[in-house]
């Protein structure tokens, strides 16, 4: 089983989870992660790096230059959106694997009589709340941060003295960064208006009372200036930390969550294990008419 990774930590988690679910279904021994995207990503994409090593999960990685070169060719071919039989033929010749895009993934997952021949190579984002939540007991243990990062978190003032010592904490994630600076990301996603966050805070406080707001953003200076005079607001500044999973862990430990149109804070909220949590998510995830499968029935969509 191959999983071709791309994107930031949130996207990598969706891709790994989908591959893991299918691996268990097919009873395959190994799950091989292809990280060649991070060495040769498209110019229009935001530069990312492999980050799944921040969790206690098991995987193999492509090791030979031959395999990496072959996958790199496949990635370039896949950008042209060729007919499935053409792409599958290329996969078969180069990798001796079956190409498995998202649409075919669900057919295979739901086929109880599926016969495994050459194995499969998953190639999509798999951003599907229903898929992940229907396998919650399987997926939740996978994305627990490793011991080294847990020790770092336990030493953070924002965790020890703010999140752990306040019963009513709400994480608030504002994604700016590449949604502003990268034309492709800006056109596809767009930045949520502040009105969304104001409505979300009002909703949670109407239900659960006054909250301590823990602000997370990839534009820390902007966040610090924006919330400088707000009582009970704390802006998390881990900008010099190279581990994205730390802020995600902190989000998950807040009582409630207000997420951005970002898979990163989606996972922060999903990993939250408070039974009476309130999660507020954007009703409109993408700019234009693109539809999302990331909404959860139990979350409040504004």
Swiss-Prot record:
Record-level GO cellular component terms: membrane
| A molecular function (GO) term | galactoside 2-alpha-L-fucosyltransferase activity
List UniProt keywords, sorted A-Z. Glycosyltransferase, Lipopolysaccharide biosynthesis, Transferase
User: Any keyword DNA repair?
Assistant: no
Q: In which pathway does it act?
A: Bacterial outer membrane biogenesis; LPS O-antigen biosynthesis
**EC number of the protein:** 2.4.1.308
Give the catalysed reaction(s), semicolon-separated: beta-D-Gal-(1->3)-alpha-D-GalNAc-(1->3)-alpha-D-GalNAc-di-trans,octa-cis-undecaprenyl diphosphate + GDP-beta-L-fucose = alpha-L-Fuc-(1->2)-beta-D-Gal-(1->3)-alpha-D-GalNAc-(1->3)-alpha-D-GalNAc-di-trans,octa-cis-undecaprenyl diphosphate + GDP + H(+)
Top-rank taxon, per record: Bacteria
GO BP annotations of the record are: fucosylation; O antigen biosynthetic process; protein glycosylation
UniProt similarity note:
Belongs to the glycosyltransferase 11 family.
> What is the role of the protein in this entry?
Involved in the assembly of the O-repeating unit during O-antigen biosynthesis.
- Quote the record's miscellaneous comment: O86:H2 and O86:B7 subtypes share the same O unit, but the O units are polymerized from different terminal sugars in different glycosidic linkages.
Protein's name according to its UniProt entry: O-antigen biosynthesis glycosyltransferase WbnK
Q: Which organism is it from?
A: Escherichia coli
Q: Which gene encodes it?
A: wbnK
């Amino acid at each position: 089983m191959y999983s071709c990774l791309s994107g930031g930590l949130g996207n990598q988690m969706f891709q790994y989870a989908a591959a893991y679910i299918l691996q268990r279904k097919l009873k395959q021994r190994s799950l091989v992660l292809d990280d060649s995207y991070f060495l040769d990503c498209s110019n229009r994409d935001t530069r990312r790096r492999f980050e799944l090593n921040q969790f206690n999960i098991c995987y193999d990685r492509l090791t030979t230059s031959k395999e990496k070169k072959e996958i790199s060719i496949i990635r370039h071919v896949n950008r042209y959106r060729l007919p499935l039989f053409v792409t599958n033929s290329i996969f078969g010749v180069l990798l001796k694997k079956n190409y498995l895009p998202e649409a075919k993934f669900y057919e295979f997952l739901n086929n109880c009589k599926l016969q495994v021949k050459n194995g499969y190579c998953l190639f999509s984002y798999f951003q599907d709340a229903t898929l992940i939540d229907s396998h919650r007991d399987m997926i939740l243990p996978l994305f627990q941060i490793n011991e080294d990062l847990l020790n770092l978190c336990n030493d953070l003032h924002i965790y020890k003295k703010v999140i752990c010592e306040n019963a009513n904490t709400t994480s608030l994630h504002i994604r700016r960064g590449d949604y502003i600076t990268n034309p492709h990301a800006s056109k596809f996603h767009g930045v949520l208006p502040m009105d969304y966050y104001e409505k979300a805070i009002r909703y949670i406080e109407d239900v659960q009372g006054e909250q301590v707001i823990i602000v997370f953003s990839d534009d820390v200076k902007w966040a610090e200036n924006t919330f400088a005079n707000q009582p009970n607001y704390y802006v998390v500044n881990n900008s010099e930390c190279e581990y994205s999973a730390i802020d995600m862990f902190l989000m998950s430990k807040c009582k409630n969550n207000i997420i951005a149109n970002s898979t990163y804070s989606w996972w922060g909220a999903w990993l939250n294990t408070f039974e009476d949590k309130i999660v507020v998510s954007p009703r409109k995830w993408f700019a234009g008419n693109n539809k999302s499968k990331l909404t959860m029935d139990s979350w409040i969509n504004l």
